Swiss-Prot record:
<dbReference type="InterPro" id="IPR025887">
    <property type="entry name" value="Glyco_hydro_31_N_dom"/>
</dbReference>
<dbReference type="InterPro" id="IPR017853">
    <property type="entry name" value="Glycoside_hydrolase_SF"/>
</dbReference>
<feature type="active site" description="Nucleophile">
    <location>
        <position position="451"/>
    </location>
</feature>
<feature type="binding site">
    <location>
        <position position="581"/>
    </location>
    <ligand>
        <name>substrate</name>
    </ligand>
</feature>
<dbReference type="InterPro" id="IPR011013">
    <property type="entry name" value="Gal_mutarotase_sf_dom"/>
</dbReference>
<dbReference type="InterPro" id="IPR048395">
    <property type="entry name" value="Glyco_hydro_31_C"/>
</dbReference>
<dbReference type="Pfam" id="PF21365">
    <property type="entry name" value="Glyco_hydro_31_3rd"/>
</dbReference>
<dbReference type="Pfam" id="PF13802">
    <property type="entry name" value="Gal_mutarotas_2"/>
</dbReference>
<dbReference type="InterPro" id="IPR048488">
    <property type="entry name" value="AIMA-like_N"/>
</dbReference>
<feature type="active site" description="Proton donor">
    <location>
        <position position="516"/>
    </location>
</feature>
<dbReference type="GO" id="GO:0000272">
    <property type="term" value="P:polysaccharide catabolic process"/>
</dbReference>
<dbReference type="InterPro" id="IPR000322">
    <property type="entry name" value="Glyco_hydro_31_TIM"/>
</dbReference>
<dbReference type="Pfam" id="PF01055">
    <property type="entry name" value="Glyco_hydro_31_2nd"/>
</dbReference>
<keyword id="KW-0119">Carbohydrate metabolism</keyword>
<dbReference type="InterPro" id="IPR013783">
    <property type="entry name" value="Ig-like_fold"/>
</dbReference>
<dbReference type="InterPro" id="IPR051816">
    <property type="entry name" value="Glycosyl_Hydrolase_31"/>
</dbReference>
<dbReference type="Pfam" id="PF21568">
    <property type="entry name" value="AIMA-like_N"/>
</dbReference>
Length: 723
């Protein structure tokens, strides 16, 4: 067997061994051609009138190493997905005109050939073959990437001034100000180290230009296709993938940051106000996979007097069908139709002997319940409900399709080869969520952790709403969160979804967290940046796995600094990764961190932060409502209120929590003092009640203190929170 796919597996950042690189070469560029022919002794490319012998290669090992996010169970799968045995490659002469090519694989006296492929050189031209709509005089240097196959991309330049700052582009982990950086906007599951790699689960083709002269503005490329950005000197170059029409639709918003954000959200939608309970502490651990474990963890919260408002149960179904409690007894619905609550019974010796009673008990204690989801359907089971559901998805037209009409199978490393429901249309959204309705209506589940959503790879995938993959893939996580929000609303509940992936339009759909991260100080800093950039784009309800979820248990200092900061973020949650149930445990519960580190300060200080968080819930609820009404972020970068103060850019991790509180997380180990910049105004140190002048102020930061300052005008109302 010999395989060559010009686009490869369409990993956005890596090359697969059967790929053409580049897929769309420029005139005068050579092309690297790859094939996979595991049993071949010799492979030859028929390239026009030339015959090019291929050499055996080591299947993108460098890409696999670069993309593995570090230690963790997903890193192995990630690296493995890019490898292949029997990889061959050859570099062609520079491409000057369209060329047809094919491959011949030889083994002994036998030969096998591929079909013919064609590649055409492309050139950038300033000829008026397309149109940039909108932008006016801000748009310069318009060019189009053209080949004999059509117009593929457009690019243009936006003028910047000295001192202008670029903030936005969705959730970004590497820097608040993206001036001088190169980035793109494509939904991608980067397992850890997102800031190092410059990738994100939640991109948006939108940014603020915070003007050094006070004349700010912003822009939105109205597309769901991939875009690229590069700023050098006083210009921002924007490159846009095109569809059938050579048109770029660009919106420009003039005004201060809040005005710019309002213009953007008026187009794409804004957050829906969620109930106050979402601001309480969330507790989670992937290995809490039985009723006994979940109950025990919540009992310990109670016994140690550590308030908790929600528990996220990830392994309730053990990642098989994600619809039925593990060990439940039931009859398979062979047509893939939804079960009802009365269709199930639960074994006394099973993992979840009485999940309804467990949820009722948690509710009686004031603890909400969130269940994990992923928008994939496993296919490795030949019998049972999972197999019936997979067959129904394909048979009844609910699957995302390949260009040839077959069902798309996940090309990524997590749930490989799984089917993907086509959530672009209401028909499939209803079919997919109806299987979970009994969880909401009978079990009284309060929300869903809508994990994943980054699994669509392929420019030519086919969606039922008429889009192809190049246009529909980035929108997939938006449809996904919407589907579960609609399910919850239909049952009379708030649309509490908890997602990591998203795109333009995600602002209207629930809560987000920063995704997979190690327990390191660098990840802590990256997560703060992620929260601020997401907020700049209209994400209101946002959090992270405090102190990271992956790798060894964090030391006490990192854990407590992260908990202190998280008490002053929109969502406060701890979580731990799957670790094959090995010992020692890697739970991030405060008592386990205390036991692991031997530091007896952890539990009392964490209790202090969680109790303080309870007192902040009314303030956070009030401020979230104000955010939605005014478009001034809840976790607010300082430039929204102090855009004309150049000093704020020297303090990129500081932020306002609502209108009244300024937060400066302690982000380095071993700190005994910490310096905060207080913009113009009158401020109160919330821990001492002392009035503090604006400017640079340094205070002691023992582990129980994160620098927080309140505007003096609201101190009388907020003082009881900190008493």
């Amino acid at each position: 067997m010999i395989k060559h796919r010009p686009h490869g597996i369409e990993h956005p950042y890596a090359v697969s061994p059967d790929q053409r690189v580049p897929v769309l070469p420029l005139a005068g560029e050579p092309v690297l051609l790859g094939v996979v022919a595991p049993e071949a002794d010799r492979v030859v490319c028929e390239w026009g009138t030339l015959e090019l012998p291929l050499s055996a290669t080591s299947a993108a090992a460098a890409d696999a190493a670069a993309l593995a996010g570090g230690e963790g169970h997903l890193s192995e799968a990630q690296a493995k997905s890019l490898g292949a045995d029997g990889a061959w490659s050859v570099q062609t002469p520079p491409l000057a005109e369209p060329v047809k090519y094919r491959f011949h694989a030889h083994r002994g006296g036998a030969a096998e050939s591929t079909e013919w492929f064609e590649v055409s050189p492309a050139v950038w031209t300033a000829d008026g073959v397309g149109e940039v709509r909108g932008g006016g005089e801000r748009v310069r240097g318009v060019e189009w990437l053209v080949s004999s196959q059509g117009v593929h991309r457009g690019r243009f330049r936006l003028q910047l001034q000295d001192g202008d700052r670029l903030v936005g582009f969705g959730e970004r982990y590497d820097a608040l100000d993206q001036r001088g950086r190169e980035l793109d906007a494509v939904v991608f599951e980067q397992y850890k180290a997102q800031g190092v790699h410059g990738r994100t689960y939640l991109p948006m083709p939108f940014a603020h230009v915070v003007g050094a002269d006070g004349n700010g503005w912003g822009f939105h490329v109205r597309t769901s296709r991939r875009t690229w950005y590069s700023s050098a000197g006083n210009e921002l170059t924007v490159e846009v993938a095109l569809g059938d029409e050579p048109v770029v639709d660009l919106a420009i918003y003039e005004g201060d940051p809040a005005t710019v954000l309002t213009g953007f959200l008026d187009e794409v939608g804004r957050a829906e106000e969620l109930p106050g309970w979402v601001f309480r502490l969330w507790a989670s651990g992937n290995e809490w996979n039985t009723q006994q474990l979940v109950t025990a963890r919540m009992d310990t919260h109670r016994d140690l007097a550590i308030p908790v408002g929600a528990v996220v149960i990830e392994a309730w179904s053990d990642e098989q069908g994600i619809t039925i409690w593990r060990d439940a007894v039931y009859a398979v619905t062979e047509d893939g139709s939804a079960h009802r609550a009365e269709d199930f019974s639960y074994r006394p010796d099973g993992a979840w002997p009485d999940p309804k009673a467990m949820i009722d008990e948690l509710h009686a204690r004031g603890i909400k319940v969130i269940l994990w989801q992923i928008p994939l359907q496993k296919t490795e089971f030949s019998t049972g409900q999972v197999a019936a559901d997979a067959a129904a998805m394909v048979r009844d037209g609910h699957a995302v399709l390949e260009a040839d009409g077959t069902a798309y199978r996940n090309r990524g490393w997590w749930f490989p080869q799984a089917l993907m429901p086509d959530l672009s249309v209401q028909r499939t959204r209803d079919w997919w969520t109806e299987k979970r309705r009994y969880l909401v209506e009978h079990f009284d589940v309060d929300g869903f952790k809508t994990d994943g959503g980054e699994h669509a790879w392929g420019h030519d995938l086919v969606y039922a709403d008429g889009r192809k993959g190049d246009e529909g893939n980035n929108l997939y996580p938006v449809h996904y969160a919407r589907a579960f929000g609609d399910l919850l609303r239909s049952a009379g509940k708030a649309p509490v979804t908890f997602s990591r992936a998203g795109f333009t339009g995600s602002q209207a759909h629930g809560i987000f967290w920063a995704g997979d991260e190690d327990s390191t100080w660098q990840a802590f800093r990256s997560s703060v940046t992620a929260g601020l950039t997401a907020a700049s784009c209209g994400i209101v309800y946002w959090g992270w796995d405090l102190a990271g979820f992956s790798g060894p248990v964090p030391d006490a200092e990192l854990y407590l600094r992260a908990a202190a900061a998280s008490a002053f973020m929109p969502i406060m949650q701890y979580h731990s990764e799957f670790n094959h149930h090995q010992l020692p445990l890697r739970d991030r519960t405060p008592w386990h961190v205390a036991e692991t580190t031997g530091d007896d300060r952890v539990v009392p200080l964490f209790r202090r932060f969680a109790t303080l968080r309870e007192s902040l819930v009314p303030y956070l609820t009030e401020q979230a409502a104000r955010t939605i009404a005014t478009d001034r972020p809840l976790m607010r970068p300082l430039f929204f209120d102090h855009e004309n103060d150049p000093e704020i850019w020297n303090h990129p991790y500081q932020y306002l929590l609502g209108d009244e509180l300024l937060i400066n997380p302690v982000l380095e180990p071993g700190a005994t003092t910490w310096t905060t910049y207080l913009p113009a105004g009158e401020w109160i140190d919330v821990w001492t009640g002392d009035r503090v002048p604006s400017g640079l102020v340094t205070r002691d930061v023992p582990l129980e203190v994160v620098p927080v300052y309140c505007r003096a005008s609201r101190w009388s109302e907020l003082q009881p929170v900190f008493s």
